[in-house]
């Protein structure tokens, strides 16, 4: 039946689109047959309202067919959809004239309120695109198909939808000849938010001369590290470590292939408000600078090629370049003779680098000159692992800006911080300083070790930011270091990150290589799992009120943090709540009276020790009270034991069994004293811990006061030393002046001797004062050291 109806619908739709209906009477006949195919022959025929052209039927309002029930609306809607689909295949030869276009209703009146927002269901909005694009592959579809009977949407929203549809259609049509731009949002999303690539460098001359072996083997997107190890009995063996990443590049891969695997997929989406970051990580001497050097130049070539396209040149898109470094937690502009920069946040919490000079670039050769100039200014040094090691993080930023119509003279007069133009996209290339282990820096001086500590700190902060970014966390810890603060806008919003891990293949650098690969693996670990930390936390939580008999009060008791000092109190609280919740006619004070009479110790937080109220005398009446516990109490306490968390498990598992046993049998006099002794021991242990904690709390404030006083005295000593240096410089200037005067002919030697004596006395007094302050501080240091040694055992 359904197949026959569809065939009738198709035949009727074909007849409607034949254009062979000369009169309105013939059109009414075909229309009646079309409606009859869906069992809607009783509805009014709207052909008369459309003139002689039946191609306007898909755009008619449903009210034009007369009054309808909900079921009839649905059938009519399906009928109109079939009409539209059949009309699509034969609409090539139809081109609307100016008269017919003017006669059509506006785009807002095409559909009834039941159809608004349902363009993805097959009803094409002819005013949202050109008639020549009806058969184009760029048909705007909705991600879901809403119900045809949804309530009418807002008119403003409908207009915004049409504007967005027109804009997206124009952009896709214009971007077709570019070839580099993505064709759909699906392809944009195909570019991974974070991509980890590993590059293996070849053995260098020094390693070849030492006849070191290559311990890294590459296979597709995975690699294996063959680590040479030695057992306890000095037997040599090889341990294999396998890693898998997005891409693994061996020593034969050129820089051009590295660019195609890392940066090239990101370049087109830079023009879609994307902020990308590419950085190289690895031990010092693993080839980071060699890898990063050609990447910005290739990226500029592709960016300039796109900027020359009419799509962007007509919008006044321009490319800007800046180059700076982070050395020792400070920022320096590499293109302005290492001018010191400041990092600030504006009112919108956007990071601004005050004083950073940006340069508009329009040629690749200009970019090469800027990069060479910046590399010459970059901080380098010699370490135990590399003779010429990068000791700073160099950041090269390429920013695409959309400029407004401004005179060139005005733009030149503006400061570099206030350049006109809105940021469209940005890509940052970061050549990180080499990571190093503390064991390799023993032969370095103090300054080199401080540099290494700052470098490792910033690298760890960068790793945490990338993991938070890949995990879609709400908070990204970009304040961990200056490096991540500067790159804050690259870690939020629409961002992409590419990490190139450079490794050394020789056996001597095996530990460094493993550390680098583990770092990269941690960065990529959350990408593999695809689970956020929130989901993991939700899955790991135990079921809370799963049993319907377990009330909310019981749940609160279960998840209350266990405290050793409240062991008896917790027992009493559970018993009281269970007895109060029971509906049987039992004396509600019975458990409390039993507890007080039976001698179970009540614990006092103020005194910090247990005091048994009375000696235990097990009488028959007490045993009857014990045996009269309701069975509901034991059942509930058994449920409490099942839901209780693992912490405090020993004490909590011991308690619920006892009431259950008491309810089944009489309690002997030997059982209850054992329970009493156990609780007394527990309370005594808790009291001792409480008193120890109290003593520690009493002594901690004095320790803090001593440390604060010592720090204040240290600052005073340093300030006094600085003042003494300034005074000494002033005295030296006075002495130079005296020497110049005494060299003059006719000078008075008596004046020279008197003034020199006064100057030397001042110098000696200052030195004596500084020495006295230094001696006092040394004495305080020794006292503090002795006190700290005494506190260690406790």
UniProtKB/Swiss-Prot annotation:
Changing residue 334 to F: In kin13a-3: Enhanced petals and leaves size and overbranched trichomes. Its main location: Golgi. InterPro entries: Kinesin-like_fam, Kinesin_motor_CS, Kinesin_motor_dom, Kinesin_motor_dom_sf, P-loop_NTPase. Residues 705-742 form a coiled coil. It comes from the Eukaryota. ATP binds at residues 282-289. Residues 193-526 form the Kinesin motor domain. Keywords: ATP-binding, Coiled coil, Cytoplasm, Cytoskeleton, Golgi apparatus, Microtubule, Motor protein, Nucleotide-binding. One of its GO terms (molecular function) is microtubule binding. Residues 525-699 are annotated as: Disordered. One of its GO terms (biological process) is metaxylem development. GO terms for cellular component: Golgi stack; microtubule; secondary cell wall. Expressed in leaves, roots, young and mature seedlings. Preferentially expressed in the secondary cell wall pits of differentiating metaxylem vessel cells (at the protein level). Disruption phenotype: No obvious growth phenotype, but leaf trichomes with 4 branches instead of 3 and decreased size and number of Golgi-associated vesicles in root-cap peripheral cells. Smaller pits in the secondary cell walls of root metaxylem vessels. Enlarged petals and overbranched trichomes. The keyword ATP-binding applies. Residues 569-579, 650-668 have a biased composition (Basic and acidic residues). It is found in: Golgi apparatus, Golgi stack; Cytoplasm, Cytoskeleton. SMART domains: KISc (SM00129). Residues 580-593, 611-632, 669-696 have a biased composition (Polar residues). Component of the active ARAC10-IRC5-KIN13A complex. Interacts (via-C-terminus) with ICR2 and ICR5 (via N-terminus). No interactions with ICR1. Belongs to the TRAFAC class myosin-kinesin ATPase superfamily. Kinesin family. KIN-13 subfamily. Internal motor kinesin involved in trichome morphogenesis. Participates in regulating the formation of Golgi-associated vesicles. Plays a central role in microtubule disassembly via the active ARAC10-ICR5 cascade, which establishes the secondary cell wall pattern in metaxylem vessel cells. Acts redundantly with KIN13B to modulate cell wall synthesis and cell expansion via the THE1 pathway. This is Kinesin-like protein KIN-13A. The gene is KIN13A.
């Amino acid at each position: 039946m359904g197949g026959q109806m569809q065939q009738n619908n198709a035949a009727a739709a074909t007849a409607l689109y034949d254009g062979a209906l000369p009169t309105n009477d013939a059109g009414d006949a075909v229309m009646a047959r079309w409606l009859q195919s869906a069992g809607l022959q009783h509805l009014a025929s709207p052909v008369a309202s459309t003139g002689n052209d039946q191609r306007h039927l898909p755009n008619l309002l449903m009210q034009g067919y007369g009054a309808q029930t909900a079921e009839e609306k649905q059938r009519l809607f399906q009928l109109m959809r079939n009409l539209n689909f059949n009309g699509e295949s034969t609409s090539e030869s139809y081109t609307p004239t100016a008269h017919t276009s003017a006669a059509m209703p506006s785009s807002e009146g095409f559909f009834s309120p039941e159809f608004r927002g349902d363009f993805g269901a097959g009803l094409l909005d002819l005013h949202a695109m050109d008639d020549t694009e009806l058969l184009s592959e760029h048909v705007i579809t909705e991600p879901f198909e809403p119900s045809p009977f949804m309530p009418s949407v807002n008119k403003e929203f409908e207009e915004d939808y049409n504007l967005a549809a027109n804009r997206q259609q124009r952009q896709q049509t214009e971007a077709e000849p570019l070839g580099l731009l993505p064709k759909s949002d699906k392809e944009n999303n195909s570019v991974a938010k974070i991509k980890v690539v590993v590059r293996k460098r070849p053995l260098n001359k020094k390693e070849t001369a030492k006849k070191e072996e290559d311990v890294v083997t590459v296979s597709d997107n995975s690699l294996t590290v063959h680590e040479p190890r030695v057992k306890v009995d000095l037997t040599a063996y090889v341990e294999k470590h396998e890693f898998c990443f997005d891409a693994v590049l061996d020593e034969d891969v050129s820089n051009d292939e590295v660019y195609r695997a890392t940066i090239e997929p990101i370049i087109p989406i830079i023009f879609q408000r994307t902020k990308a970051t590419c950085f190289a990580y690895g031990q010092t001497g693993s080839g980071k600078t060699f890898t990063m050097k050609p990447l910005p130049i290739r990226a500029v070539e592709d960016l300039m090629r796109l900027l020359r396209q009419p799509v962007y040149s007509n919008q006044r898109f321009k490319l800007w370049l800046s180059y700076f470094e982070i050395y020792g937690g400070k920022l320096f502009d590499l293109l302005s003779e290492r001018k010191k920069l400041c990092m600030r946040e504006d009112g919108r919490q956007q990071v601004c680098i005050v004083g950073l000079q940006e340069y508009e670039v329009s040629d690749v050769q200009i970019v090469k000159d800027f990069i060479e100039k910046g590399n010459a200014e970059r901080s380098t040094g010699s370490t135990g692992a590399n003779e010429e090691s990068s000791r700073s993080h160099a950041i090269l930023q390429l920013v695409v800006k959309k400029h407004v119509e401004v005179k060139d003279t005005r733009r030149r007069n503006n400061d570099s911080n206030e350049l006109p133009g809105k940021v469209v996209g940005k890509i940052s290339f970061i050549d990180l300083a080499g990571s190093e282990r503390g064991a390799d820096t023993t032969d370095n001086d103090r300054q080199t070790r401080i540099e290494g500590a700052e470098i490792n700190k910033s690298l760890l902060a960068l790793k945490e930011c990338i993991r938070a970014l890949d995990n879609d966390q709400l908070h990204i810890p970009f304040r961990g270091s200056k490096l991540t603060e500067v790159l804050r806008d690259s870690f939020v919003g629409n961002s992409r990150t590419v990490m190139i891990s450079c490794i050394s293949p020789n056996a001597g650098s095996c530990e460094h290589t493993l550390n680098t690969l583990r770092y990269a693996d941690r960065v990529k670990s959350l990408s593999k799992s695809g689970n956020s930390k929130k989901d993991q936390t939700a899955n790991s939580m135990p079921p809370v009120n799963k049993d319907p008999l377990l009330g909310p009060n019981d749940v609160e008791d279960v998840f209350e943090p266990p405290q050793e000092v409240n062991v008896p109190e917790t027992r009493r609280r559970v018993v009281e709540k269970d007895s109060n919740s029971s509906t049987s006619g039992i004396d509600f004070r019975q458990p409390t009276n039993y507890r007080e009479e039976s001698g179970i110790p009540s614990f006092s937080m103020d005194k910090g020790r247990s005091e048994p109220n009375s000696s235990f005398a097990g009488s028959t009446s007490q045993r009857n009270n014990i045996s009269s516990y309701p069975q509901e109490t034991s059942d509930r306490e058994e449920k409490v034991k099942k839901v209780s968390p693992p912490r405090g498990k020993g004490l909590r598992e011991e308690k619920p069994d006892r009431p259950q046993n008491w309810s089944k049998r009489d309690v002997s006099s030997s059982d209850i004293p054992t329970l009493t002794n156990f609780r007394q021991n527990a309370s005594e242990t808790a009291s001792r811990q409480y008193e120890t904690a109290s003593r520690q709390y009493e002594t901690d404030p004095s320790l803090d006061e001593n440390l604060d006083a010592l720090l204040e005295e240290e600052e005073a000593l340093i300030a006094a030393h600085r003042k003494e240096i300034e005074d000494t410089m002033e005295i030296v200037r006075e002495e130079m002046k005296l020497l110049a005067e005494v060299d003059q002919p006719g000078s008075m030697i008596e004046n020279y001797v008197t003034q020199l004596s006064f100057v030397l006395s001042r110098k000696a007094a200052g030195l004596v004062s500084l020495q006295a302050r230094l001696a006092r501080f040394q004495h305080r240091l020794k006292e503090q050291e002795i006190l700290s040694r005494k506190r260690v055992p406790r």
